[in-house]
Amino acid sequence: MTKSGTTVPCSPHRAERENKMGGWAIAVHGGAGVDPNLPPQRQEEAKQLLTRCLNLGISALRSNASAIDVVELVVRELETDPLFNSGRGSALTEKGTVEMEASIMDGPNRRCGAVSGLTTVKNPISLARLVMDKSPHSYLAFSGAEEFARQQGVEVVENEYFITPDNVGMLKLAKEANTILFDYRIPTAVYDTCGAGVESPLQMNGLPISVYAPETVGCVVVDSEGRCAAATSTGGLMNKMSGRIGDSPLIGAGTYACEVCGVSCTGEGEAIIRGTLAREVAAVMEYKGLGLQQAVDFVVKHRLDEGKAGLIAVSNSGEVAYGFNCNGMFRACASQDGFMEVGIWE
């Protein structure tokens, strides 16, 4: 993996996670850029949620579920839990409302669906799936997406359902600091973009605000047939302008899957968009002949400029990989040959 903008050796158990017999593999993330002072209890809560979602995906894969069904299933679970910044628990706009976005992509035929500006849809990732399966389009946003949701009969709730007391407090702090909380995390005025910097003077409940700092979620899967899929969901930036769209719903930027691999990204959205980060992993595999972990390391090092981000990926041969150039990334991964890892730091 990569860290702090430089390439460091990958641990052997993770650098080449290829199942020689093929088979399924899965990775889940809950965001890159973690406060090094994150209290142990918050770390454990995140690991428990990631483990639960990973096991949910593993169970489905063992039951021969398809990759596209598994990524939707896992991300729905992440959206339902308020710990991370997607679905319930999403970051708030400058108006104090929630505008969510998500995307999903099925690798074998490169079908995709994406949504933005959702305010009432309980599970944005499932609406993105319906855009892919039930509409002639790839991307619907704001009132058009909401209308489509009602036509399809998906579960909708009041906007207040998504708002948590922690996020109300964070929005207040962001407004007082006259800034946004970059990727639902740390005021850019007092912290660098991935959690490493001087101690923030802003606190909530006596703790640095970055302890309330999970962000974008995603899942990538290759099933036993070698089919790859990817899904990503987020509430975006705290105190963002209404109408802002990040990388998560943009196919090729925050999410991508093809016959070669599946990728989900997290971090500084504008940098991920400029680097078309998710597609770049597939491109260097296809055109430079790199393996999955090599491709991940390459794009994190060479395609982010000064941006901070991370990503998870799987290949059609059963490899699973991840990389990030900041302090940490909430992640969990497993493969059919018995490998499993749940972690935050390097």
Regions found by a protein language model. Give the residues of each.
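Alpha/propeptide regions of enzymes that mature by internal proteolysis
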Residues: 2-3, 7-346
